[in-house]
Amino acid sequence: MKIVEKIKVDCNYALVMDNWYSPEEYDKALEECKFMTPYLLKPEKSGTAKDKEGNPLKNNRAAFLSDVFSQFNTSFIGKSSINLYHSNILEKLASEDNIYSYLFDCNAHDCLVSYYEEAAYYEAHSDSATITMLTWLYDIPKSFEGGDLILINKDNTTAGVIECVPNRAVIFPSYMKHQVTEVKMKEVTDKNKGRYTISQFSMIGAVR
């Protein structure tokens, strides 16, 4: 894992990290994402952020690991998610921005697997957690355009745009507004060639 970029959003920093997984781990995580695809749910049933009228802000399919696997640690993604909490990782993150010191106190986390294909997007929103980490996975060569992450300041100006790159992780305080640009498939197929995201939500308190 290597921190390749720091993006200031209001008074804190989002950190962009490449090569989050080893090549072998990446293949296993992507394989599990594809395994989960038939179980992914529509926005209304997968923990979506909503607008003031109660309408979903996203157009994708998703499911929490805890909704698919009877035991969290039977999932490869679930087992490997603990890597974020290794002391050397936590210390490195906290040295970049002290807000990541909250990770030392987080005592609950869950992972949401999302899939974006033709016309999928997620409008500007924040998350109901303490720290959010997004990791992107897809087959190479890339079969889509879009799916980039936009970070938004409190005054609704754009703080940064992060290109969707395979095995790239982005970590940020969950209060930060962010959105996903619309995905356009180069060719519409049924072969799961779109964009997968593992959203790891770290919380202080009980799991959702």
Task: List PLM regions with ranges.
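Catalytic core of Fe(II)/2-oxoglutarate
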Residues: E145-R208
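Short beta-strand segments enriched in hydrophobic/aromatic residues
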Residues: Y21, C33, L137, S174-M176, ...
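A short glycine-rich, His/Asp/Glu-containing loop-to-beta-strand
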Residues: L103-Y115
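Short histidine-centered beta-strand/loop micro-motifs
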Residues: Y122-D127, G160-E163
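Short, conserved beta-strand element in jelly-roll/cupin
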Residues: Y115-Y116, S126-S143, Q200-I204
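Residue-level detector of short, conserved catalytic/binding motifs and their immediate flanks
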Residues: Y13, C111, I131, R168, ...
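Membrane-topology and secretion signals of cell-surface/extracellular proteins
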Residues: P43-G47, P56, Y100, T132, ...
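Non-heme Fe(II)/2-oxoglutarate
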Residues: M1-I99
